[in-house]
UniProtKB/Swiss-Prot annotation:
Modification 2-(S-cysteinyl)pyruvic acid O-phosphothioketal occurs at: 117
Species: Blochmanniella pennsylvanica (strain BPEN)
Name assigned to this protein: UDP-N-acetylglucosamine 1-carboxyvinyltransferase
Localization in the cell: Cytoplasm
Binding site for UDP-N-acetyl-alpha-D-glucosamine: 93, 307, 329
Gene: murA
InterPro entries the record matches: Enolpyruvate_Tfrase_dom, Enolpyruvate_Tfrase_sf, MurA_subfamily, RNA3'P_cycl/enolpyr_Trfase_a/b, UDP_GlcNAc_COvinyl_MurA
Family, similarity comment: Belongs to the EPSP synthase family. MurA subfamily.
GO BP term, example: cell wall organization
Length: 421
């Protein structure tokens, strides 16, 4: 097995222009939603990511024809199995998004759970509860979940126990082919939900309310094909804005959506950043000033995104003063903290909160990437740290950032990928 590392020599200021890629959290559910139609679909602005590669392999394994170049062409008319391979599913929990479209169109779907553990079961509870209310029969075993229905799924009024982006996608996608009207209350409001809904509308579903906490879906008997372009990735945008903020420099994020990052922009302005924006770009300039520490509390959209928490941890540890990060969405999402402490950060963990005391500089060392967003914060930390930083297990970052080392090099970083066998 090969393991990639990043070797980063710092400190180097990061500045310039960066082109923002398509949103991973839109691209994945939209690719799985192509299973709802037997008509061909062309999808533009799909990011080049490991999770996208796995999704395309999974669709191909189910029998779909997929051509993946600059544009992704998907034809699922030849799908001949409703069971997703464990070897593919185990590496990506987002594969649960195949279940709703499979049972909605073919009457059956079987998805192996990642790792086949109790944690996996808890992760799919909201998904399967929603499908059950749409009329699916669910068999939930230790290693897999099967959904089946005689005839079509039927519309339902579903009140979600808690806000969940993933479960909202599953229910909305399955309801696209259900008989009658489905109402989702307490739905997730993320821009990626709106993007997925717009794709389903393009296929022929009637959807209202996406982006609010109540979504209404009028199911169609059959869906068509068409062309669709994925929205820009707001988390990638936020990551590069933080890159310039911690470097005390400037950046322009081209092909972005400022309207999806209001809370992030608000907090960056609180830190002292000068921010300008247009319809499809955001510019940040620190004018050489050290940032001021801020307090953020993660919330479902439109609140501060949990996927920006690790990046703002980095911002706080190199800022003036004391800042707090409060995590309310996920447990155990502070795994980047011990790695940053090894680089000289002053951080204290208090239950679901971390308190950061700003330091003048960080010191390069060898660190371990533990998850997607944590790995991004460690890479940025390496860019501004004194000396050599080695980031292990960068496959995490390949899951969610399109050619991050190339984009950082264009901004001035001294970063190299090394493959160890």
């Amino acid at each position: 097995m090969t393991v990639d590392r990043f070797y980063i020599h710092g400190p180097t200021p990061l500045s310039g222009e960066v082109n923002i890629s398509g949103a991973k959290n839109s691209a994945l559910p939209i690719l799985f939603a192509t299973l709802l139609t037997e008509e061909p679909v062309e999808i533009f602005n799909v990011p080049k990511l490991k999770d996208i590669d796995v999704t395309i392999k999974l669709l191909t394994q189910l029998g779909a024809k997929v051509d993946h170049c600059d544009v992704v062409f998907v034809d699922t008319s030849s799908v001949n199995t409703c069971c997703a391979s464990y070897d593919l599913v185990k590496s990506m929990r987002a594969s649960i998004w195949a279940l709703g479209p499979l049972v909605a169109r073919f009457g059956e779907g079987k998805i192996w759970l990642p790792g086949g553990c109790s944690i996996g079961k808890r992760l799919v509870d909201l998904h399967v509860n929603g499908l059950e209310q749409l009329g699916a029969t669910i068999i939930l075993e230790e290693e897999y979940v099967t959904a089946s229905v005689n005839g079509r799924l039927h519309g339902a009024h579903i009140i979600m126990d808690k806000i969940s982006v993933g479960a909202t996608v599953t229910i909305m996608s399955a309801a696209a082919l259900a008989e009658g009207v489905t109402i989702i209350d307490n739905a997730a409001r993320e821009p990626e939900i709106v993007d997925t809904a717009n794709f389903l509308i393009m296929l022929g579903t009637n959807i209202n309310g996406a982006g609010s906490n109540r979504i209404t879906i009028e199911g169609a008997q059959k869906l068509g094909g068409g062309k669709y372009s994925i929205m820009p990735d707001r988390i990638e945008t936020g990551t590069f804005l933080v890159a310039a903020a911690v470097s005390r420099t400037n950046v322009v994020c081209l092909g972005s959506r400022p309207d999806t990052l209001r809370f992030v922009i608000k907090k960056l302005r609180e830190s002292g950043a000068d921010i300008n924006m247009g319809k499809d770009w955001i510019g940040l300039n620190m004018h050489g000033k050290r940032p001021k520490a801020v307090t953020v509390c993660t919330k479902p959209y439109p609140g501060f995104p949990t996927d920006m928490q690790a990046q703002f941890t980095l911002l706080n540890i190199v800022s003036k003063g004391k800042g707090k990060i409060i995590e309310t969405i996920f447990e155990n999402r502070f795994m980047h903290v011990p790695e940053l402490v090894r680089m000289g950060a002053r951080i204290k963990i208090l239950n679901n909160m971390i308190v950061c005391h700003g330091v003048d500089s960080l010191i390069g060392t060898q660190v371990m990437a533990t998850d997607l967003r944590a790995s991004a914060s460690l890479v940025l930390a390496g860019c501004i740290a004194e000396g050599l930083t080695i980031v292990d297990c960068v496959y995490h970052i390949d899951r969610g950032y399109d050619h991050i080392e190339k984009k950082l090099r264009n901004m001035g970083a001294h970063i190299k990928r090394v493959t160890n066998k």
